[in-house]
Amino acid sequence: VVGRGGMGTVWRAYDEMLDRDVAVKEVHLPERITEAERKVLCRRLLGEARATAALRHPGVVAVHDLIVEDGRPWIVMEFLESRSLHGLIAECGPLGVRRAAEIGADVLSVLRAAHAAGILHRDVKPSNVLICEDGRVLLTDFGLAVHMDRGREAGETLVAGIEGSPAYLPPERVNGLPSLEASDLWSLGATLYTAVEGFSPFLRCHALASMLAVLLGDYARPERAGALTPVIEGLLRQRPEDRLSAEATAMLLREAADLAARPGATALPVAAARPGAG
């Protein structure tokens, strides 16, 4: 076993036909499940496979195949020696500002590619960010992903109830409103906060308390973020239209990484974190 998530377990396996290691995602099916519910889960996994396969990006794990056996689907994917950002923080503690900014820029690059393809990730969090041994950064687990156009046309999934990790759900999702591109960016902001501070800004003793903290914008100002402070605070704004755009975020992440590399680095002025239209 190389990973576990809310939807399934990822196993390391060997492809005898092509002589290569692969990762195989097994879906967790509840013990008592109706046929209709099983179909929903299978459809979600198929959606994940299609969403991932549609993205030609170095920050996305390649999908090799989708197999259905005894009514249960499995995704066969590229295997990479890696560990999650969550695991890295748990083992080594908070990241430095420069490294966090670089990882954030890589995750943002995947999100921009996904958004350009009409796909929302909807579950950006440290456990879904993988750091490979060669330094490559990947955004994985598109299990809650939805295609924006198809979701709106079908009238489903975009308002599919509250799913995901409560501490990384943006306010509009907690309120049961549709996901937006800005929703993924908010979750990126919460992930960056966790990377530099070592804990989630909205994690509380139970899920409802976490969601209430999200709705109230109740989090402590980051103390270790340095030059990332305006990025984090700009992404965690309550209203989607007030958040930093992807373009502004990319620019500020580059500036933060450059500034953090200099001796005596300090945070950029908060005024620099302006919301953008894109």
Report each predicted region and the residues it spans:
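Activation-segment/catalytic-loop signature of the eukaryotic protein kinase fold
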Residues: L66
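Activation segment signature within eukaryotic-like protein kinase domains
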Residues: I103-G104
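Protein kinase catalytic-loop region centered on the HRD/HxD motif
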Residues: V107-I119
